[in-house]
Amino acid sequence: MVSFTSIITAAVAATGALAAPATDVSLVARQNTPNGEGTHNGCFWSWWSDGGARATYTNGAGGSYSVSWGSGGNLVGGKGWNPGTARTITYSGTYNYNGNSYLAVYGWTRNPLVEYYVVENFGTYDPSSQSQNKGTVTSDGSSYKIAQSTRTNQPSIDGTRTFQQYWSVRQNKRSSGSVNMKTHFDAWASKGMNLGQHYYQIVATEGYFSTGNAQITVNCP
């Protein structure tokens, strides 16, 4: 999902400029939910779709959200925090997919500019398969593959930039559990994969020319 990642992150980054942030406003599910980000029930949320698929995103009570999509485009959305930290994140729910998709803790840092994923579940594409293998880390009942890649002149939260992409990809897939982000951050740092000042950090559902649906609850705020 190499091209998918860069396309999505650019669009998510752009939402702050393209759409006024919403505060404590529930999105109404429709054929294509408008792009946006903001806070809802104290949780940060972000949603973006390229409009190529029938896709809906709905903020629910507390840290819950739901998303459903049809084939034909790119989309990503979820709830969490802004800024991110080395917190332990607990999430639960259902995640159904047919094709290329992720369920992941997803975030960005600046100085250095880094896009990161802790992938908990994925569809037909393992994102670590086309990145530099950096070993493994065991956390929360599973081994995770660690990988790193360089995105050259790609869209980012700060416009078109060259930046690093960090991955931890869980081998025992799941759709509910706890993620100790400190374990992953420490493992990355031990391999020279350093982070900077945190921007947002969400439990995200992504789809790329696939179909699926998810109902996820995150332990935010």
UniProtKB/Swiss-Prot annotation:
| Pathway(s) this gene product operates in, as recorded in its UniProt entry | Glycan degradation; xylan degradation
Subcellular locations according to the entry: Secreted
Q: Which gene encodes it?
A: XYL1
* PANTHER family the UniProt entry points to: ENDO-1,4-BETA-XYLANASE, ENDO-1,4-BETA-XYLANASE A-RELATED
What does the UniProt keyword field contain? Carbohydrate metabolism, Glycosidase, Hydrolase, Polysaccharide degradation, Secreted, Signal, Xylan degradation
Q: What is the purpose of this protein?
A: Major xylan-degrading enzyme. Contributes to the hydrolysis of arabinoxylan, the major component of maize cell-walls.
The keyword Secreted belongs to this UniProt entry's keyword annotation: yes
Catalytic site positions: E115, E206
The record's principal subcellular location, in a coarse class, is secreted
In what residue span(s) does the GH11 domain sit? 31-219
Pfam families for this protein: Glyco_hydro_11
Q: Which residues form the signal peptide?
A: 1-30
Q: What is this protein called?
A: Endo-1,4-beta-xylanase I
Organism from which the protein derives: Cochliobolus carbonum
